Structures are given as C-alpha cells and as structure tokens.
Amino acid sequence: HCVTRRQRQMCIRDSSTSYVYTFVSAFGEEGPPSPASTVLTKVDGQTVTISGMDTATSKSNTNLANKRIYRSNTGSNTTNFQFVKEVSLATASTTDNLNNDALAEIIPSTYWIAPPDDDTSTYPNGQMLGLTAMANGIFAGFSGKRICFSEPFLPHAWPVAYRITLEEEIVSIAMAGQVLFIATKGTPYIAAGTDPQSMSVIRMEAAQACLNKESLVDMGDLAIYASPDGLVGASGSEITVLTAGLITPKQWQAQFYPSTIKGFLWQGKYIGQYYTGSAYGAFMFDYRGGKNSFTTISSLATGHAQGGFTDPDDNELYLIDYDSGGGNAQVELFQGSTTNTTQTFKTSQFVLPRPTSMNFVKVEAEAYSGSGITVKVFGDGTEIFDATITASGSVFSATGSAPTSFSATTIMEPILRLPTGVHKVYEVEVSGAHTINEVCIGESIDELRAI
C-alpha cells in the first residue's frame, strides 16, 4: 500500500515494460517488429540500456539503413509499443531515458511482413507473382490460389490478414476498369474495394479459363485474355467472348494455339503472338471494330517477341525481340517501319439456308500496287478460288492459281468471277500490304456493284 504522497507517485510511475525494434530501409520502408525483450520494471527518469540488436543485413537484400526502437506502454485499457528513437543499422546498443508521456506514435508495422517468397516451407505455392497496381495506392499479387493485397502506398507491406484464398488456381491478374480481374484455371473472379481490409472477391458466372498468363492484358476499360473459346473481355462484373462472331472455338484452337499466346497493348488494340510448334504467328484485334476487327499478321517482330512494354508517353509498343536461335536480343518498335507488311483477314463462316452458287467476289482496297491484293474463297471448307488483283492506274489485272492457274487478265473493276458450284458454307480470305475496305461475294455482278 502507498501511504505517502511520494510513495503514491512512485507507484504510479513504476511500470513493467519491454522493447522491440524494426528494420528500416534507405527508402523509409519499415518491417515487422523483433520478438519482445524480457519484461523489466522501469521508473520515469531511469536510464535503460538496450543491447543485442542485429547489425547485419545478410538475412535480407533490402538495403537496410536504420532501426526504430519501440517501448511498451500500458494505458487505462490497452498496452501498445510506442516509438522511442531511431538509430543506425550499425548500432548494436543504445539507451532510453524517456518518460512514458514522452513516447511517440504507436508502432504501425506490427503486421507488415513481406509478400510470399520462394521459401516453400512457409509458402508451398511459391513466391508471389503478378504485381499489379490498384486504386488508392494498393498493390495486388497472387500465390497459388491466394490473392494478396498490400497496405495502401506501402508496396513492401503485405499483412496475412489481407490474403484471400479462392477455389481456383490463379493464372494471372490485371485491372479491368475499376476492379481487379483474377484469371484462373477455371472460373474467373473479380476483386473490388478501396481498402485492403475490406476487399470483396466475387466469383464470376462464366467458366472461361485463362490458358496462358502472358495472354492477359489490361486494355484500360477492360482486360482481355485467351480462353479455350476465343479472346475473352472482362469489364466490371461482365465477361464476354469477344471473338465469338469472328472465329469459332474450333478455328481458334486449330489456327491460333491459345495456350501459347502472348498479348500486348498497342494504340487501343490487342496484339497477340502465338507459336505453332515450328513457327511464330501474330494477330491484331480491335475489340471496338465489329466484324472487321481481327487481322492476322505475318510476324510481330524480326524474330519473335519475348516480352514487350507499352509506353504511356507515346502510346507505342516496344518489343524485346529474339532471333530464331534464341539469341541476339534487341528492342524493336512495333509498326516502326515505313514499309507495310502483308496482312491477312479471313471471315467467319457464312452458313446459308441451302446450297447456293456464289458467282462473283469483290475486293475494295485503297491500292493494288506492288504484289497486289490476294483473295481466296472457300466452299464447304475447301479452297475453290485463289487470285491476285493488281492495278495500273484505273486498269485492273488478275492472275490466279485456283481452281486452275490462269494468266494475267484485264478487268475494269475489282470483281472476279468464281467457278461454278453450289456450297452451303462460304468463307473469304484476303491479304495484301494495302488497306482493304471491303470484301464481299454475291450471286450476280449487279448485286455487288450496288453495294
């Protein structure tokens, strides 16, 4: 019992306390606290020596520079560690003589641990991948089935409480408008929220798996990736197969090898590179362009693109290009040449109610110079016509190789007669180094002239 005023004051000022310290990088990034020291009794005004603090950085490759020391302080309801002082990394011991009421802010980094790393004893699914910036300074990443979020504006701090486990294995993540799109090996998810403590994760009602993490691209207002059925677009809570009216799932799998697709953003368009097993191919897709939006490209780079970056300052796509042997890496500007490359466009299948004879094909292009414009027509899956149109002034010339070869024939307009035959399913393919405005087939020449 305290029987005098002086003894009563000493009882109030005596307190049980302990210390922790944190590492701080040269950039001000603070880590989680050390284990607490042995509890001791401290009286205000008493000097305590703090010793045994680590001074080496061998356990971390994070450019550590300082240590922050905190002391426990018990209030009326809770006990918190409060700031005492900051010392250099090389300091192994220091002293503390602060009174309780002189202690500063409560330690903020109690739960600020690093993201999952490659220590499989702690993280069996491996290190965190897919670092993505969200709104309000939050970063997201994933490991296995777990989606992780950082503290706002602190990309080094990833509390365990901010990690959510999904039902599906995560393949990749990207922003899709105002939400985070989570592509998986099964059904995709979205995550939305302004605070990592209250993130909402929703499973979408569409079984569209992501076949390759490198196919997922943030297009600004939506995310696009390669699924088994075609290119899929995700915006908000909506998900759509964008190429459904252009390419059938069977064509998509057979011609574009979606599990190999690497995607890039170029001037609002999705650029894809794929690998057939023996050669590289590419395509360009404008999701706002309707039925004329999908164009194949002979090649994306001189060799093949290993990676790429869209520069927001000039809206250009820069590719890391490798030659066919896998060496001689260089950076190339996509579409940086003044010479047009050959483009190829093939329509989707036109299925007629009954077998019909389509007798003419028309190709309207900006120019027909050089190697001209080649047009192929397919009937019921078989190539029935192959010809090339060139022009000199207003006079056109056509040469062909199907159904049989024919030499240069002068024509007055870019309309060609097709071989006789009836078919129920038609497809048309055009290629050339000039802008092609229109391609159509019809039963009569007057029908095409009227278009």
Residue ranges of model-derived segments:
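Short loop/turn segments that connect beta-strands within beta-propeller blades
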Residues: 153, 193-196, 237, 287-289
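Beta-strand-rich modules
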Residues: 15-28, 96
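Extracellular fibronectin type III
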Residues: 26-42
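Solvent-exposed loop/turn segments flanking beta-strands in beta-repeat/beta-sandwich domains
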Residues: 57-69, 73, 77-78, 370-374
